[in-house]
Amino acid sequence: MVLSVDSNEPSYFGNNLECEIKPLPEGDFWIEIGERRIVVERKTWDDAYNSWMQKRLEEQISRILENHEDYVLLIEGNKQSSRLWRNKQFHQIDSLQKFLNRMSLEAIPVIYTSSKKDTCSYLNYLSKRVEEGKFMHLIRKTTVLKSSRNKYHNIMSMIPGITIDRSKTLY
């Protein structure tokens, strides 16, 4: 597993992550294991707003979507510490939040971290999940029930799209 950091990113990341520093054509971090690559684009709130207003953010997201299969948009910092918030430009930051919500729903997962330290923790966590083969796998825990009939309903409800009520009509 290799974590690569774009050479334009702050030296903080190179000093606090086990990584290679090199120019990356898209994204700010790449997590690679075998043929799989996860691209992480990092933005502070102010940077995200400026990029969004100049339409660069949409272009960056489009390039990542076209060229990679796994990707994340990471927004770093707190809204309250952004220049927009300090200047009481709440409408602009709300508009950006709506755009990010839409992107998260329609195009790219959006992750929020509170600081560079938190970003490093998230990247280490994501790297570990990728390395363990757990990235993009969600496993629901089963509940132990006494009735054998209820046990089958519970097992069936683990299938995506099947609720307990639906499993009762099926079995």
Predicted segments, located by residue:
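Short hydrophobic beta-strand segments
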Residues: 1-8
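Short N-terminal binding/cap micro-motifs at the start of the first secondary-structure element
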Residues: 10-15
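Extended, alpha-helix-rich binding/interface surfaces that flank or overlap catalytic cores
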Residues: 20-158
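C-terminal active-site rim and adjoining tail of enzyme catalytic domains
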Residues: 170-171
